[in-house]
Amino acid sequence: MKKPFHHQAGFTLVEMMIVLMIISILLLVALPSMTKNNEVAGDKGCEATVKLLQTQVHAYEIDHDRLPTNLDALKREGYVEHTECPNGKKLTLRNGVVAISE
């Protein structure tokens, strides 16, 4: 004997619209905080890069008895691989001090 076919109703168009509206509202609330967190992470990454480069400037000075003329000298000599921040900000070296370019 066959089982009777039970008709299961799906979502109506109105129900789907309500679900999509709720998801959209949740995204509108969540996206700004995620964007802010990305900016904070980028700034922290830049601060860490500055500290790393400053340490390598001191190592260069110890090895060569003079300060490097620019950050590219650190890269050429193999002290670092990158001389810019992860968030794209440029860095400069003046009188042995690494700083973020304005």
From Swiss-Prot:
Disulfide bonds join C46-C85. The modification N-methylphenylalanine is found at F11. One of its GO terms (biological process) is establishment of competence for transformation. It holds the Pfam family N_methyl. The keyword Metal-binding does not apply. The transformation pili are flexible filaments, consisting mainly of the major pilin ComGC and smaller amounts of the minor pilins, including at least ComGD, ComGF and ComGG. Homodimer. Forms higher-order multimers. Interacts with ComGG; the interaction is probably direct. This is Competence protein ComGC. It comes from Halalkalibacterium halodurans (strain ATCC BAA-125 / DSM 18197 / FERM 7344 / JCM 9153 / C-125) (Bacillus halodurans). The gene is comGC.
